[in-house]
Amino acid sequence: MNAHKTAQNMSQEALYDVVRAPLITEKATLLSERNQVVFKVAPSATKPQIKAAVEKLFNVKVTGVNTLVQKGKVKRVKGRPGRRSDIKKAYVQLAEGQSIDLTAKLG
């Protein structure tokens, strides 16, 4: 697959540009019991890139990736309306029996 070839050639910094940070929320904690992990990813990242980056960074087998773009909220900044940035989330399904310890790897 083409995404695997590009991930093998990517540097460690480039992989962290694709997968930026884990998202630790109540929903993400519940999903971790079903072998799913949630990451904040680059807005331009594709599903094959995300899959390849997670497999290489964490040495796990990924069976699926679902993504969504969470639109930024409108907030007031110094009395004027402003807007937070949009973020892209990736829900990564791991193979049976695999897990990622996010506190040890990224801490």
Curated annotation (Swiss-Prot):
This is Large ribosomal subunit protein uL23. Gene3D superfamilies: 3.30.70.330. InterPro entries: Nucleotide-bd_a/b_plait_sf, Ribosomal_uL23-like, Ribosomal_uL23/eL15/eS24_sf. Keywords: Ribonucleoprotein, Ribosomal protein, RNA-binding, rRNA-binding. Pfam families: Ribosomal_L23. The gene is rplW. Coiled coil: none annotated. One of its GO terms (biological process) is translation. GO terms for cellular component: ribonucleoprotein complex; ribosome. GO terms for molecular function: rRNA binding; structural constituent of ribosome. Part of the 50S ribosomal subunit. Contacts protein L29, and trigger factor when it is bound to the ribosome. It comes from Gluconobacter oxydans (strain 621H). One of the early assembly proteins it binds 23S rRNA. One of the proteins that surrounds the polypeptide exit tunnel on the outside of the ribosome. Forms the main docking site for trigger factor binding to the ribosome. Belongs to the universal ribosomal protein uL23 family. SUPFAM superfamilies: Ribosomal proteins S24e, L23 and L15e. NCBIfam families: PRK05738.1-3, PRK05738.1-5, PRK05738.2-4, PRK05738.3-2.
